[in-house]
């Protein structure tokens, strides 16, 4: 049997049984296969690294021709085992494809004539464990036997990267983690409209590492080895430290786990009783769109942001840093006056 393949990356999903309406008929020619490509905006899942996709097909009678079938990359096409064949009457099949599998996404996928949803999807709290979620829809019939069905996958999440820099040579900043604070964390995706419906649930997303990054004048990535965050598209509502220092309203912010000293070694933040590192934060209110990558560059050259809003109010009298307060005051500056010379008198000295 002649097989064809396509290009995309998908996680494994078991093949469900295929239900075929008798009036549709079966074409015993070439098996159904796909050619896949990805949009170019996000980087985690690409045309080059996509090797499996999960596909559901719906026939002209609104019956599931097959459900959650796994198609695997084979040279230029993606094909399934067992193979599925085109309806012999030339009627169309509607395809709904996605990657990775629902089991990897940690949510429930239902695709049929009336419902086409990924329900209660939540990105992993650990950024290093998050997945890029891609989908594609297409229609095809037996005229696609030779060329395969072209699928163009699009990224359905927003990609977030955090960088930082410090151009102030008077201070040393060392970083061991980042946090994306309080975005909405759960939603349902509609494969038909390609839209999200979000809940009110919020959470924090975290990436930490043992090897500290020392900031310099050029921006450096802070996401660690696990890559960038993949989060739900949404309009963020910013944390407002001026009126809500402890962030009771769960406004959005970025936080960096830092150790701050002067270049001569004087400790600035945190105090010794807290530990070597603690979090500093800044509010954000971006409108995250699906398929868009957002790069935040935090510039510590002129300040260190606010104390972590989720830090408990300190009971240690040696810890002056309360949630939402500025880490540093205004730049140190001086007014300088040079006094006039006074006449000390003249003396004649005999040698």
PLM regions: where:
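Extended serine/threonine-enriched, polar tracts that run as long, contiguous segments within proteins
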Residues: 214-285
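Short, low-hydrophobicity acidic/polar segments
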Residues: 20-185, 200-201, 205-224, 231, ...
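Hydrophilic extracytoplasmic domains
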Residues: 262, 270-351
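Positively charged n-region of N-terminal signal peptides that target proteins for export
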Residues: 1-4
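Short aromatic-acidic-glycine turn motif
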Residues: 182-194
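Sec-dependent N-terminal signal peptides
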Residues: 7-10
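C-terminal motif of bacterial Sec signal peptides marking the signal peptidase cleavage site
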Residues: 14-17
């Amino acid at each position: 049997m002649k097989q064809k393949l396509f290009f995309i990356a998908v996680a494994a999903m078991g093949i469900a049984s295929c239900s075929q309406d008798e009036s549709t008929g079966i074409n015993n020619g070439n098996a159904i296969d796909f050619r896949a490509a990805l949009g170019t905006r996000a980087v985690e899942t690409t045309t080059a690294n996509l090797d499996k996709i999960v596909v559901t097909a719906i026939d002209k009678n609104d019956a599931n021709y097959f459900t959650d079938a796994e198609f695997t990359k084979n040279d230029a096409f993606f094909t399934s085992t067992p193979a599925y064949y085109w309806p012999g009457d030339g009627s169309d099949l509607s395809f709904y494809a996605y990657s990775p599998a629902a089991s990897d996404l940690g949510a429930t996928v239902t695709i049929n004539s009336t419902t086409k949803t990924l329900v209660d999807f939540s990105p992993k709290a650990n950024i290093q464990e998050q997945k890029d979620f891609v989908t594609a829809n297409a229609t095809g019939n037996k005229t696609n036997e030779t060329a395969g069905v072209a699928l163009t996958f699009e990224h359905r999440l927003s990609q977030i990267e955090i960088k930082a820099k410090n151009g102030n040579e008077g201070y040393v900043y060392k970083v061991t983690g980042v946090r994306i604070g309080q975005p909405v964390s759960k939603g349902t995706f509609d494969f038909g409209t390609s839209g999200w419906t979000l809940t009110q649930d919020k959470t924090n997303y975290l990436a930490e590492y043992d090897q500290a990054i020392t900031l310099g004048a050029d921006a450096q990535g802070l996401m660690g080895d696990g890559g960038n965050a993949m989060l739900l598209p949404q309009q963020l509502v910013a944390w407002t430290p001026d009126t809500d220092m402890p962030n009771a309203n769960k406004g959005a912010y970025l936080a960096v786990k830092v150790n701050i000293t002067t270049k001569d070694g004087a400790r600035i933040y945190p105090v010794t009783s807290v530990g070597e590192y603690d979090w500093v934060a800044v509010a954000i209110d971006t409108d995250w769109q699906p398929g868009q990558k957002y790069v935040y560059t935090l510039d510590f050259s002129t300040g260190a942001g606010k104390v972590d809003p989720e830090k408990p109010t300190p009971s240690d009298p040696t810890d002056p840093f309360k949630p939402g307060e500025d880490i540093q005051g205004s730049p140190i500056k001086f007014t300088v006056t040079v006094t006039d010379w006074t006449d000390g008198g003249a003396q004649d000295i005999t040698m």
